[in-house]
């Protein structure tokens, strides 16, 4: 699949009694794949597993950013679900160079800014701002 506009792509799945959403920064050139590992194993030596892959075919140096959000709940006795929709509104790379990477995550009424210093890990940090 593709997100021709770029920005953020989301994939929500259900596991156990919870919902999980992968919020991934993508570009218009990004290729998104749902995979089934072990599907072509004629001897059935591999455990069948599913996977999600983001590929940047033309990139030589690329930063991948994915935020995994746990949300919602399925009540097996009542057969009802609540909070199915993720609260993450946006994930974006503000800046990215050899020195540091800055990412913003809009979540509900808050914006989380994450800074990763590639040269000095002690300068890596985060800040939460209310809109």
Task: List the model feature ranges, each with a label.
Residues 1-131:
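CBM-like, beta-strand-rich accessory domains located in the C-terminal region of large
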């Amino acid at each position: 699949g593709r997100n021709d506009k770029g920005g953020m792509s989301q994939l929500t799945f259900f596991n156990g009694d919870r919902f999980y959403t992968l919020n991934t920064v993508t570009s218009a050139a990004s290729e998104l794949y749902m995979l089934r590992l072990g599907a072509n194993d004629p001897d059935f030596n591999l455990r069948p597993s599913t996977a999600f892959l983001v590929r940047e075919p033309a990139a030589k140096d690329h930063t991948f950013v994915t935020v995994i959000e746990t949300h919602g709940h399925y009540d097996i006795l009542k057969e009802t679900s609540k909070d199915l929709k993720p609260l993450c509104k946006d994930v974006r790379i503000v800046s990215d160079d050899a020195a540091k990477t800055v990412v913003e995550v809009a979540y509900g009424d808050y914006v989380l800014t994450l800074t990763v210093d590639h040269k000095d890990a002690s300068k890596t940090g985060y800040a939460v701002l209310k809109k």
